[in-house]
């Protein structure tokens, strides 16, 4: 199956984008596809060989899943790649300094329609953009 690529432009400096993308406390705030979803737990050891573990689910408790990966490559403010425990790979490219374009390319799973997987990723990126741009307006964060 062909990889899926999605991207979004975020009107925030790269230093803040990088922090918000990678800090577990921030990940819990933006990593969702709608107000019905949440990420109640996030662990992130951002280094080659380090682990990323996100627990995502519906707020009503009707469905949840673990998103677990090991980092392959990390280049600060530029690039992240990881391999999921099931063997699929994902790459995230950060381009520009302000605004920043985030481009995520990932291998889709075999169980869900490609369009659904693309829509899910686009919704997460849109949630990140909204969160990041709101944080930029908060002087204690930026």
Name what the model sees in each region.
Residues 131-142:
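Short, highly charged C-terminal tails/helix-capping segments
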Residues 17-20, 27, 52-54, 71, ...:
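Hydrophobic pocket/interface hotspot
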Residues 6-8, 41-44, 67-72, 89-96:
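Hydrophobic/aromatic beta-strand elements that line small-molecule binding cavities or substrate pockets
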Residues 1, 62, 85-87:
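Glycine-centered tight beta-turn/hairpin loop motif at sheet-sheet or coil-to-beta transitions
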Residues 13-15, 46-47, 72-77, 93-101:
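A short, structured loop/turn motif at beta-sheet edges
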Residues 79-123, 127-130:
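Beta-strand/loop substructures that line and gate deep hydrophobic ligand-binding cavities in soluble
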Residues 39-83:
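Glycine-rich portal/gate segments that line the openings of hydrophobic small-molecule binding cavities
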Residues 1-37:
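Hydrophobic ligand-binding cavity/cleft-lining segments
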């Amino acid at each position: 199956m062909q990889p899926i690529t999605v991207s979004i432009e975020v009107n925030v400096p790269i230093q803040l984008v990088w922090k918000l993308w990678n800090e577990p406390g921030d990940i819990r705030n933006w990593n969702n596809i709608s107000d019905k979803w949440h990420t109640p737990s996030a662990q992130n050891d951002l280094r080659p060989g380090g682990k990323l573990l996100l627990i995502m689910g519906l707020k009503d408790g009707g469905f949840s899943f673990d998103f677990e990966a090991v980092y392959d490559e990390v280049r600060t403010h530029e690039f992240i790649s990881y391999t999921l425990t099931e063997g699929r790979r994902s790459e995230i490219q950060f381009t520009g300094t302000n605004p920043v374009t985030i481009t995520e390319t990932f291998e889709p799973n075999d169980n869900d329609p490609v369009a659904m997987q693309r829509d899910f990723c686009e919704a997460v990126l849109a949630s990140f953009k909204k969160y990041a741009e709101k944080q930029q307006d908060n002087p204690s964060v930026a």
